[in-house]
Amino acid sequence: MRFRHPDGSTVHLAYCTNVHPAETLDGVLAQLRDHCEPVRRRLGRDRLGIGLWLAKDAARALVTDPAALRGLRCELERRGLEVVTLNGFPYEGFGSEEVKYRVYTPDWADPERLEHTAALARVLAGLLPDDVTEGSISTLPLAWRTAYDDGRAETARTALRTLAERLDALEDLTGRSIRVALEPEPGCVVETTRDAIAPLTAVGHDRIGICVDTCHLATSFEEPATALDDLAQAGVPVIKSQLSAALHAEQPHLPEVREALAAFAEPRFLHQTRTATSAGLRGTDDLDEALAGDALPDAGPWRSHFHVPLHAAPAAPLTSTLPVLTSVLTRLVGGPHPLTRHLEVETYTWQALPPELRPRGRAQLADGIAAELTLARDLLTDLGLKELP
């Protein structure tokens, strides 16, 4: 979906396909047929943006076989789909029964992360629509925080500088500008937008910036205006924003709230949980840890890294951080010029929701994704953007 900003620039809205992950190219093609095109049809649009997640095997198949890449591009066009952004965070296995900490490997101190991201950039350059010259890729925020020392930090910094050089060369070759964005996430070396400033300014290249995930920002209790102002003052570009909402519990000390939260403690994904105290942010690596005894202070609200559907907040006594998303979006695209032109709805946890909230089959999932995109579209038009055909 494309929108015209009042300044005349085009803002792209997509949804991320990691909600129905596929490990192979054949799986990606099936995904377009079974999921993405049905969402487009529900929206009644001739064109729908998708943020592709390409696992390592799918990416390698595309980067080593020009015919396969052309075939994917043709299939996208045939189904009324377009790609201007990729989710390069998970490397493989995102559809596994247990993902948890595995999603953080390989990290940016491992040469394979550089090679995978460079391959994604080459693929994206070949998938961009003819009238689009800029693409974006979101990626791991350096590494999970443990066992990350000065030596690994220097290796990661060197890898990002090397990537920037390769992206320069890619534009010289293809005429397509691809940029890569670190996506701050609770528990990682770069947990917040403020944490991103030092490593990104150390890299010192405008092709390497930040992806603002509104669920992650909310989970860390960041104030949107302050976070985005700090990035602007530091000269860190917002390359992409993922529109998502976290799980919010206003009164976590109450037994009924604990019971409601427990329904979201599931074995597949990591649900980092945070609370803001007078001594600073406190947290646990997972929701079940927070619910166990007194691992986390409960005098104030808790927020958990569980991407809940944008249009359907959990029932009381829980809610979502949708107001934070709205504030971030207002700051990003509600001003005289957009701070980013790539927006991606990312709710990958539909099948991890409590059983009674999960979609039953492909049709209900497509309905839900279409409803999320409709909400995002309405937020954008309320900010003065006009949807393009």
Labelled PLM ranges:
Residues 1-126, 135, 359-389:
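N-terminal pre-domain/capping segments
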Residues 1-5, 97-210:
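Active-site acidic/histidine proton-transfer and metal-coordination neighborhood
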Residues 11-18, 46-52, 83-88, 133-139, ...:
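Hydrophobic faces of well-ordered beta-strands that scaffold small-molecule active sites
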Residues 21-30, 54-68, 145, 187-191, ...:
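Acidic-and-aromatic substrate-binding clefts and catalytic sites of carbohydrate-active enzymes
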Residues 41-44, 75-80, 123-132, 166-178, ...:
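A structural motif corresponding to the C-terminal end of an alpha-helix
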Residues 90-99, 138-147, 215-221, 242-265, ...:
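Flexible glycine/acidic-rich beta-alpha junction loops that bind and position SAM and/or redox cofactors
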Residues 166-288, 299, 308:
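Acidic/histidine-rich catalytic cores of soluble enzymes
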Residues 287-385:
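Flexible, acidic glycine-rich loops studded with aromatic residues
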